[in-house]
């Protein structure tokens, strides 16, 4: 995992596993934090994958790309997503939130659902999470880095690149999709 300051240009295009580019919108609005600064070794040491974390400004998780919801945990604290290009992400809302048994969460998708970029996937009550003594910092990890190549975070964006996916970038400002579009 490397961090770069130079801006990155990316195109918002359909993606295939070989050579095209995809823009991946941020799943949650907030301040980006290097994954190494997450106060949980499971995330900070890259045991589940590399990426970044976000200190959320609001309690909403949006689809960062078109693809599929691979899994939503029974406790609703985490989502596994797969883009049409094959990038797999784990979005883990807060730390130790598995112990909250789903109470502060409301899912808008289920495992196996197709998702579209900007679609609301999950809502969470940040005050309830904090009241339970859990940090709200939200790790966002590429879990199949071995298939997509290196993970580089640049100036508020995450870049996934390698021999099979030439580039995918994660913008840090989610946009909701209007109903009916």
Language model segments and positions:
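Contiguous, well-folded functional domains in the mature portion of proteins
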Residues: 2-181
């Amino acid at each position: 995992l490397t961090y770069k300051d130079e801006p990155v240009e990316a195109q918002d295009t359909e993606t295939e596993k070989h050579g095209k580019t995809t823009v991946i919108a941020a799943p949650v609005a907030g301040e980006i934090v290097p994954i190494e600064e997450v106060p949980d070794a499971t995330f900070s040491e890259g045991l589940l994958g590399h990426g970044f974390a976000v200190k959320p400004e609001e309690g909403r998780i949006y689809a960062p790309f078109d693809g599929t919801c691979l899994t939503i945990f029974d406790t609703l604290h985490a989502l596994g997503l797969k883009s049409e290009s094959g990038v797999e992400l784990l979005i883990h809302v807060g730390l130790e939130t598995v112990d909250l048994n789903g109470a502060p969460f409301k899912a808008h998708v289920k495992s196996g659902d197709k998702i579209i970029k900007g679609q609301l996937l999950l809502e969470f009550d940040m005050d309830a999470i904090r009241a339970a003594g859990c940090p709200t910092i939200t790790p966002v990890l590429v879990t199949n880095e071995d298939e997509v190549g290196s993970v580089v975070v640049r100036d508020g964006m995450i870049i996934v690149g390698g021999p099979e996916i030439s580039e995918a970038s994660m913008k840090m400002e989610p946009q909701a999709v209007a109903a009916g579009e």
